[in-house]
From Swiss-Prot:
Keywords: Methyltransferase, RNA-binding, rRNA processing, Transferase, tRNA processing. It is an enzyme of class 2 (transferase). The gene is flpA. This is Fibrillarin-like rRNA/tRNA 2'-O-methyltransferase. Belongs to the methyltransferase superfamily. Fibrillarin family. SMART domains: Fibrillarin. It holds the Pfam family Fibrillarin. Interacts with nop5. Component of box C/D small ribonucleoprotein (sRNP) particles that contain rpl7ae, FlpA and nop5, plus a guide RNA. Involved in pre-rRNA and tRNA processing. Utilizes the methyl donor S-adenosyl-L-methionine to catalyze the site-specific 2'-hydroxyl methylation of ribose moieties in rRNA and tRNA. Site specificity is provided by a guide RNA that base pairs with the substrate. Methylation occurs at a characteristic distance from the sequence involved in base pairing with the guide RNA.
Length: 232
């Protein structure tokens, strides 16, 4: 068994040191022995950890790159927009631990993959729906502490504001992975990031952290905001 050093860097998020100088992070396995996307399982003091691959997770990439504000923690209720096959939502569920993570996905085929890979994580609630239409799943999703968005649409920022108005608690947090090329392939990514940030601020968010996630994803920016619509 590999000898590793584990250190908590955020609540329920850990750095794992294999002694090779490479930066790695992990979450405690909510379902020990169960892989979701072929991730490495490691052990320290009889606790199983899932190594979080930043090449397959924008949130993982942001943490590796030095994210300062991580609002997802134990007990946090989360709405995850753009769940895909469940790679990042599975780690978010590990972190939230005893709280619900609503995982929204638009494509039925991908949702089936998500259910197959994550069905043993009882705090992960699959929701089939369109993030542009929060009213369609308002009978399923409760008020949440954090919204995480990874949706490759031209109106990414507007989608976040729309969902925040339906579901985000006052002074709750949102995290959004902005994909510049999904907004406009003709513009400089920096210009797009500034435009999307402006939409978020005008919609009711105070941006408290921004981090580029290259080299893991090209032309992507992670933003973290506090929701206080009444201030704007």
């Amino acid at each position: 068994m590999e000898k590793i050093k584990v250190k908590e860097i955020f609540n329920n998020v850990y750095s794992v040191d294999f002694g090779d100088g490479l930066k790695r992070i992990a979450t405690k396995s909510l379902v020990p022995g169960k892989r979701v996307y072929g991730e490495k399982l490691v052990y320290s003091d009889s606790i199983e950890y899932r190594v979080w691959n930043p090449n397959k997770s924008k949130l993982g990439a942001a943490i590796i790159n030095g994210l300062k504000k991580m609002p997802i923690k134990k007990g946090t209720k989360v709405l995850y927009l753009g769940a895909s096959a469940g790679t990042t939502p599975s780690h978010v569920a590990d972190i939230a631990e005893n709280s619900l993570v609503y995982a929204l996905e638009f494509a039925p085929r991908i949702m089936r993959e998500f259910i197959d890979s994550c069905n043993e994580r009882k705090n992960l609630i699959p929701v089939l729906g369109d993030a542009n239409r929060p009213q369609d799943y308002s009978n399923i999703v409760e008020k949440v502490d954090v919204i995480f968005e990874d949706v490759a649409q031209p109106n990414q920022a507007e989608i976040l504001v729309k969902n925040a108005r339906w579901f985000l608690k006052e002074n709750g947090y949102a995290m959004i992975s902005i994909k510049a090329r999904s907004v406009d392939v003709t513009k400089n990514p920096r210009e797009i990031f500034a435009e999307q940030k402006k939409i978020l601020i005008e919609g009711g968010f105070e941006i408290v952290d921004e981090i580029n996630i290259e080299p893991f994803e090209k032309d992507h920016m992670m933003m973290v905001g506090i929701w206080n619509e009444t201030k704007y």
